[in-house]
Amino acid sequence: MIKKCLFPVAGYGTRFLPATKAMPKEILPIVNKPLVQYGVEEASAAGIREFGFVTGRGKRAIEDHFDISYELEHQIAGTGKEEQLQSINELINHHTFAFTRQNEMKGLGHAILTGRNLIGDHAFAVVLADDFCVVEDGDDGVLAQM
């Protein structure tokens, strides 16, 4: 069983301009969650618990999203909004997230090779976080079907 997943998220997001000029495309919201979180949730549903991200300049928001925000939690404590962070906090608490930077943009293959230090010699899945796959209730996600 595959236990690791790599997200090559270093690209410039030019297909989504001007929305991605100052925000990574992977953080663009789909309803109430960023696009990349849907990919992580799908991989998690397939039994994957370790995630590696190959990032680039301007992608710090992805790292911040998959990290605990003590300041935000403190600010919303007692407001009734704590539940809104529940889905991301469950991912953070039950999974491992690691990040490395692709210093030169040389394409998808190079990004995956750059992630080797996160994955090692283990079998792994690759999820392209700008591909949004809709799964009907009760159906397995794309990774679980493989």
Regions found by a protein language model. Name each.
Residues E71-Q75, E82-M146:
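Conserved beta-loop-beta/alpha segment of the NTase-like Rossmann-fold superfamily
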Residues M1-A77, K81-E82, G138-Q145:
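N-terminal glycine-rich phosphate-binding loop and ensuing alpha1 helix
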